[in-house]
Regions:
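A structural signal for small-residue-enriched, beta-sheet-centric alpha/beta enzyme cores
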Residues: 2-107, 113-422
Length: 422
């Protein structure tokens, strides 16, 4: 399909995770955190059980809620099912907690299922916070009924606040579009979402938790395929500090409430392509927001790599630049030091010839044919005042390209993480 034309028909809307019809959410203070002013529990519930899919951390030290949610979606080889609710707590990761942690995650599903009136396997759970501390189940016994009573079609903003840890602000986004696809033409579909993430961010499916919703009718397996592809192109292109969390979770639900009589969208159809485009818009916005809100960050950094031998090498090269402390600190210092970009590219092991490499920083040519290009230092300093810094490197070795998002590295990152548990 012609996505350039389709892009015109997408519009941003308010509401985040509850922007799509058929969903309610709540964010409350449950007691996982000591500060009574801090929301720490989010509950997202469709009006009726609906198709759901999940993508989870690749960290082998994965947390109890990841293990339980993965199992409730049919295991690692499936990843989708019919879901009645999503429970997210902040302040405690329930990771490295053994059988006690697993029992807590399973009991959370049981409590939520009793409140909603569904099967425990229809509940997905996620946790974020400090690793290695036992998560008190009694807090869920009061939190879940309270959150259920607080559910609202306008509760997306509170839910987004409740899942924050070191985030400086909540993260939510939503779009609507008018379908032109056969069987769906004229239907208005909405995709919304919320996420959290600021540190321990290099998802490989950041700590990253995201919940995406749509009111389009989608076949469950198609929903998983769509989510898996989108996560690879968006959330997996974010790195704040090169650390992959124990708790990375991305969940998507499809209520079908905007077109109850329409046939479910299946993979390979025009309707699938439309929805995938809208989901990508939401997830890319959220992913960029995570990078921009990296712990201690003052700037979003976009790293574009072109001319790689293949997609894998493009990704390796872009991540090498994005994860380099020397690159990140020179950006924090407003220093157009392209030599650090060249260093990061050269050490990462991908195939290219030095004399074929070109590097631009903030649109300024600084390296051509592997050699320095004279540039105006004052103009570079002016451009580095921008809130987003763009680094572009052409390896001249092939046709593959990618984009990775990161942030600069400041003294504040050390302060935040040095004081994290205090």
């Amino acid at each position: 399909m012609n996505t350039e034309l389709f892009d015109i028909k997408i519009r941003a809307v308010e509401g985040g995770v509850t922007a799509a019809a058929g969903f309610k959410a709540a964010g409350i203070h449950a007691g996982f955190r000591k500060n009574p002013e801090r929301l720490d529990y989010a509950f997202v519930v469709p009006d009726k059980p609906c198709p759901g899919a999940g993508v989870f951390t690749t960290n082998r030290f994965c947390a109890a809620p990841v293990q339980v949610s993965r199992a409730n979606l049919g295991g690692a080889d499936k990843g989708y099912g019919i879901i009645a609710g999503v429970s997210v707590n902040s302040g405690n990761a329930n990771a490295a907690t053994g059988e006690t942690g697993l029992a807590c995650a399973r009991e959370t599903c049981s409590i939520a299922s009793q409140v909603i009136g569904c099967e425990p396997q229809q509940i997905l759970v996620a946790s974020t916070g400090v690793i290695g501390q036992i998560l008190p189940i009694d807090t869920f016994e009061t939190a879940i009924p309270a959150a259920y009573e607080a559910l609202s079609a306008h509760g997306g903003a509170d839910a987004a606040r409740a899942i924050m840890t070191t985030d400086t602000h909540s993260k939510e986004y939503a779009v609507s579009y008018v379908s032109e696809a056969a069987g769906h033409a004229g239907n208005v579909y909405t995709v919304g979402g919320m996420c959290k993430g600021s540190g321990m961010i290099m998802p490989n499916m950041a700590t990253m938790i995201a919940v995406i919703t749509t009111d389009a009718p989608v076949e469950p397996a198609a929903l998983h395929a769509l989510l898996l592809s989108t996560v690879k192109q968006t959330f997996n292109k974010v790195t704040v500090d090169s650390d992959t969390s124990t708790n990375d979770t991305c969940i998507m639900l499809a209520s079908g409430a905007a077109a109850a009589d329409a046939e479910p969208i299946v993979e390979g159809s025009d309707a699938f392509d439309e929805l995938a485009f809208a989901v990508h818009e939401v997830c890319e916005s959220l992913a960029r927001n995570i990078a921009a809100d990296g712990e201690g960050a003052s700037k979003l950094v976009t790293v574009n790599v072109t001319g790689a031998v293949n997609d894998e090498e493009a990704d390796i090269a872009a991540r090498a630049v994005a994860n380099s402390p020397l690159v990140k600190t020179c950006i924090a210092g407003h220093d157009c030091n392209w030599g650090r970009v060249a260093m990061a590219l050269g050490k990462c092991g991908v195939k290219f010839n030095q004399e074929d490499v070109s590097i631009d920083m903030m649109g300024m040519p600084v390296c051509r044919d592997g050699l320095t290009v004279p540039f105006d230092e004052d103009e570079a300093l002016r451009r580095f005042e921008a809130s987003e810094i763009v680094i572009s490197a052409d390896l001249g070795a092939g046709d593959a390209a990618t984009t990775v998002w990161t942030c600069d590295l400041t003294h504040e990152y050390i302060s935040i993480n040095g004081d994290y548990r205090s």
